[in-house]
From Swiss-Prot:
GO terms for cellular component: endoplasmic reticulum; endoplasmic reticulum membrane. InterPro entries: AdipoR/HlyIII-related. Keywords: Membrane, Transmembrane, Transmembrane helix. GO terms for biological process: intracellular zinc ion homeostasis. The chain crosses the membrane at residues 209-229, 247-267, 284-304, 308-328, 342-362, 374-394, 402-422. It is found in: Membrane. It is a multi-pass membrane protein. This is Uncharacterized protein C30D11.11. The keyword Cell wall biogenesis/degradation does not apply. It comes from the Eukaryota. PANTHER family: ADIPOR-LIKE RECEPTOR IZH3-RELATED, ADIPOR/PROGESTIN RECEPTOR-RELATED. One of its GO terms (molecular function) is signaling receptor activity. Pfam families: HlyIII.
Amino acid sequence: MSTVKTFSSTETEGFKKRLLSRRHSSYQVRDEEDDVLEEFIVLKLDLFLTRLNHRMKRLEELGLPNRKDAAAATYQFLANLQASFLGTTILGKTQVSFILRRIEETYNDVLSACDTFPAKAQKALTFLEHHLRDLEDYAEKSKNNVETLMTDIKDVVEHAAKLGAQRLITLEELPVQWHNNPYIIRGYRFYTSKRKCFRSILSWHNETFNIWTHLSAFIVFFAVLAYFYPSSSSWVSSNVSNRIVRIFFLLSAMKCLGCSVIWHTFSSLSNYKHMRCAACMDYVGISALIAASIISVEYHAFVCQGPLRFIFIAFTGTLGLIGIYTPWKKWFNEYKYRSVKIFFFVGLACSGLIPMITMFYIKGTRRTVKYLDPVFKSIFSYIIGVLFYGLHIPERFLPGKFDIIGNSHQIWHIAIIVGVAFHYTGVKRFETDYEAFSCGVL
């Protein structure tokens, strides 16, 4: 940490000589000693600002500018002061007066007790040095606290990994960064190895049901895509664009289900960075499914309204890309933002209301409701699932009783499978009904 240099009497006399040598030969003074004192203090301020650059860089290295508290406000004041005099070689009375005004404007009455310029300048120097020292002490302590905290977290993770190598652990034993549901008390895995996570697919724990519901559905939809759809009569009767839309939806559904399996398989990794990547993949899969579901409706429903269809698909596609990008932001996987995540995906799904309302307006309520019947069933399934998931029902009422079977996340998984199945039946129906609906062909 930087310290302030103290001046001996010999150095003080040297300053006086330097200051007197700076005076113009025609400069007239009433009291030479007062002027020497005044310029001596100015020179000390000049020296303070010269050293400020190095000390501010040190504070920046300690991460002080990233804080959002009073210390950061003081740092910003000093940074602005430093920027105001960047490149200035020697201060004069005008520049010092500017510093005094800035201090008085920001800190009100701190200089009010001083009635002379030298007194104010000396007080300002003391004030600035005091605050800078406080910042340096604060930054060093914060750095030490962070290092201590990181050591503590590392110890907790290592302890949990040792327990996880022997048995399933409890929520209390699980490091807080891995918490996702405060009402699921037991049955947690915690491994240092990806291989152990993968092998745990075949073991019994609180993620087994979540893994196998979506893994089974993934296999079913893969079979549909790879065999049943290409060998069906609808493949033969469909044009290329209809095939592309159906394949696009099936791939998006499989992506959602597959990413979910990856997340629930590797959510037990003790490497936080890798665990978070698995979580992000889950969110990316959800975004892809929502966007693909809406686009599959827009493509068929507005086939005879080309410009409108293009606008809707472009809008939904853009939101889908945002949904694929946003989960990779650092804050997105934190539990305290869980409600934000839910509202984000609900909002993404609600973007489909715009084309739906347009369909009601253009084609009428009865025709639209009949045409979108499978979609409404799909939406209803998703809504039920979101309610259970968002409210932690039923485990919030009986914590620990639904750790392995019957908790809200498992209900949400079933709701997703049902919703995807309903929507897929809708996509198949759209291929035969879209002309009658969109183009008015009877």
